Design a protein with these regions (language model features):
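Beta->alpha turn/N-cap motifs
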Residues: 3-6, 25-27, 37-49, 54, ...
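Secondary-structure end/capping motifs
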Residues: 173-239
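Short, hydrophobic alpha-helical packing/hinge segments within bilobed ligand-binding/sensory domains
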Residues: 29-32, 124
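Hydrophobic/proline-rich hinge and linker segments of small-molecule sensing/allosteric domains
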Residues: 57-80, 156-172
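Pocket-lining segment of extracytoplasmic ligand-binding domains
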Residues: 116-199
Length: 246
């Protein structure tokens, strides 16, 4: 995934010489995984849950946050509780966060008659952005006076972390491939975790954002999921299934 919060898994990944790495946004990754075009990767949680018959978890690895994500943001022209009947624009990149947004708006806030549109239509009442695009929009947005961090809203609602992605690998992959990929991910994560400052410095130039802000951003993510993240996965799965979002 071409996002800063995925860099700890992929920078210097020792698998690059043997395997082809595909760089795609979460929604596209889910489509490719469903089509059999992906062997392993940090699958968007919603897509992994849809594909559990084909994919299994790869170690305890994933992308989660306990509180604010800073890169899963709903920008709105009015306060969230006043969005009844609103048109909500949803980035083409999102899979799991789009599902989370619906749970928040329709179940937490009990909003009615919402219309969701993919893309970024100018007439939308609110706009969901994720990843680096959301990080940048936090600084550049001039159209939407209200901003909501949807991962933080989940935290306030469910008192649990939010898991954006879990590492999955095809169940029919050879055992040696599964082991090799897992070891590669372990090595990349071990190498990059102490280097968040250097990664932030690099991306500050690419994204034209403050280096200190990006270092804090990277440090806020959980890449080895614990029991609280596993509980969050089960809660999200139950709610998404209950409301027919998977």
């Amino acid at each position: 995934m071409p996002y800063l919060n995925s860099v700890p898994f992929f920078r210097g990944l020792p698998l690059a010489e043997r395997y082809e790495l595909t760089d795609c946004v979460p929604r596209e990754l889910g489509v490719k995984a469903a089509a059999g075009e992906v062997v392993a990767g940090p699958l968007p949680l919603a897509d992994y849950l849809r594909l559990e018959s084909t994919f299994e978890r790869l170690g305890p690895f994933g992308i989660a946050v306990r509180g604010r994500a800073r890169s899963a943001l709903l920008f709105s022209r009015k306060p969230v509780r006043q969005l009844d009947g609103a048109t909500i624009a949803v980035t083409e990149q999102s899979s799991t966060t789009a599902c989370l947004l619906r749970l928040l708006l329709e179940q937490r806030y009990e909003l009615k008659s919402l219309q969701y549109r993919r893309g970024q239509p100018d007439e939308a009442d609110a706009l969901l952005l994720i990843g680096d695009e959301a990080l940048q929009a936090h600084h550049t947005n001039t159209c939407y006076p209200f901003e909501i961090d949807v991962a933080f809203e989940w935290w306030l609602w469910q008192h649990l972390p939010f898991v954006f992605a879990v590492w999955g690998i095809r169940r029919d992959a050879d055992a040696d491939v599964k082991k090799e990929v897992e070891v590669g991910v372990i090595k990349a994560l071990a190498m990059n975790t102490p280097r968040f400052a250097a990664i932030a410095e690099d991306y500050a130039k690419r994204l034209a954002l403050p280096e200190a802000e990006l270092q804090i951003y990277l440090s806020s993510f959980v890449y080895r999921l614990s029991q609280s993240e596993e509980e969050a996965i089960e809660r999200f799965k139950a709610l998404a299934n209950e409301h027919h979002l998977l």
